[in-house]
Regions:
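S-adenosylmethionine/decaboxylated-SAM
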Residues: 2-154
Length: 154
């Protein structure tokens, strides 16, 4: 089962109202959550190059797209298309408009914008930003105060 389906299932089962996604890329998880739940999402991404990130060169070969209410994929012809940050940000922002105030976009790196997220405010946090173990470990620890009691960090 895809991770976005699992998160949506948890959201429904636990009656989650508010979530945070750190690293949205083009918004696959966010837009699935919009379609399948009533959750309000805070979405954080820098949409910038990360030459200091060893996972940055990760080879994506599929580009998610929503068409007629369904998730589809288009093949990338090269990895540079996956990392066209301006187009990915534009794609995300354009698709986010239809969801109004259910999506709050915060541009920046997750640890740099942490003070913009209120403590004890999130039912769940989905960590999908850097993908390196040391960074994700630090990010999880830093964001724990943002979770409501009983909230999930994944």
């Amino acid at each position: 089962m895809d991770r976005y389906r699992v998160i949506a299932k948890f959201a429904k089962q636990n009656n989650w109202k508010q979530g945070l996604e750190l690293g949205v890329w083009v918004g696959v998880t966010t837009f699935y959550m919009m379609r399948e739940t009533d959750v309000k999402m805070y979405c954080v991404d820098s949409w910038e190059e990360q030459p200091d990130n060893p996972e940055y060169d990760w080879q994506f070969n599929k580009k998610p797209r929503w068409k007629d209410g369904k998730l589809t994929v288009e093949e990338f012809t090269n990895k540079n298309q996956a990392w066209d940050h301006n187009k990915n940000e534009e794609h995300f922002r354009d698709n986010a408009k239809q969801w109004g105030d259910r999506i709050t976009i915060i541009k920046g790196r997750s640890l740099a914008i942490i003070d913009q997220i209120p403590d004890n405010s999130m039912d769940f946090i989905f960590h999908d930003s850097d993908h390196s173990y040391p960074f994700v470990k630090n990010e999880i620890e830093a964001y724990l105060p943002k979770l409501k009691s009983g909230g999930y960090s994944m």
